[in-house]
C-alpha cells in the first residue's frame, strides 16, 4: 500500500502556508464560514471548522440587535447586499425581542376584565398575597369584630336603659 493521503496540499512541509492561503485573517474566516465541511471531516479537523448551529446564529443575532452591533461588525464596510441582509436580520431579531418582552409582561389570566369602557384600557392584575398582607387582613377582621361587639353592647345598654 502507498501513502494513505494522496492530496498534495496536505503533504506540504509543516510551517509553509498552503497554496490556498492568500488573504488576511478576516477574509479567511469569512471564507471558512461560507464553505461547508462534510460531517466526516469535522471530526478530524476539529471544532473550529464546524458550522455554527441555527440556534447559535439566532442567539448572536438577538444579542446584536438588542445590545447594538458587535465591535467586529462596526469597523467593517457594509455593501448594499450586506445592508439588505442585515436589515432582514435586525427585523427578525427585533420581532423576537418584542415577543419576549410581551410574553414576560402579559397580564395574568385571572385578571378581572371590567365591562366599564373607562376601565377597559387598563387591565387590573391581582397581587399575590404575602404573609404581611395576611396579617393586615386578619387585624382588619379583628378590628371589625371589636367594633361590632362594642355596638352590640351599646345597643343592649340602650335597650336596658329604656326599660
Curated annotation (Swiss-Prot):
Residues 135-145 have a biased composition (Basic and acidic residues). Residues 115-131 have a biased composition (Low complexity). Residues 134-163 form a coiled coil. It comes from the Eukaryota. Residues 1-79, 100-163 are annotated as: Disordered. Keywords: Coiled coil. Residues 54-63, 146-163 have a biased composition (Basic residues). The keyword Cell wall biogenesis/degradation does not apply. Residues 26-36, 100-114 have a biased composition (Polar residues). This is Coiled-coil domain-containing protein 140. It comes from Homo sapiens (Human). The gene is CCDC140.
Amino acid at each position: 500500500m502507498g501513502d494513505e493521503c494522496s492530496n498534495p496540499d496536505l503533504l506540504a512541509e509543516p510551517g509553509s502556508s498552503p497554496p490556498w492561503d492568500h488573504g488576511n485573517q478576516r477574509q479567511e474566516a469569512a471564507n471558512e464560514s461560507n464553505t461547508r465541511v462534510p460531517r466526516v471531516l469535522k471530526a478530524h479537523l476539529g471544532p473550529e471548522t464546524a458550522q455554527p448551529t441555527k440556534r447559535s446564529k439566532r442567539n448572536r443575532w438577538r444579542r446584536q440587535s438588542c445590545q447594538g452591533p458587535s465591535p467586529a461588525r462596526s469597523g467593517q464596510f457594509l455593501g448594499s447586499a450586506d445592508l439588505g441582509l442585515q436589515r432582514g436580520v435586525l427585523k427578525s431579531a427585533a420581532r423576537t425581542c418584542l415577543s419576549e418582552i410581551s410574553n414576560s409582561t402579559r397580564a395574568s389570566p385571572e385578571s378581572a376584565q371590567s365591562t366599564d369602557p373607562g376601565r377597559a384600557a387598563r387591565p387590573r392584575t391581582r397581587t399575590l398575597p404575602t404573609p404581611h398582607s395576611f396579617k393586615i387582613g386578619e387585624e382588619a377582621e379583628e378590628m371589625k369584630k371589636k367594633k361590632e361587639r362594642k355596638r352590640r353592647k351599646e345597643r343592649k345598654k340602650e335597650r336596658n336603659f329604656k326599660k
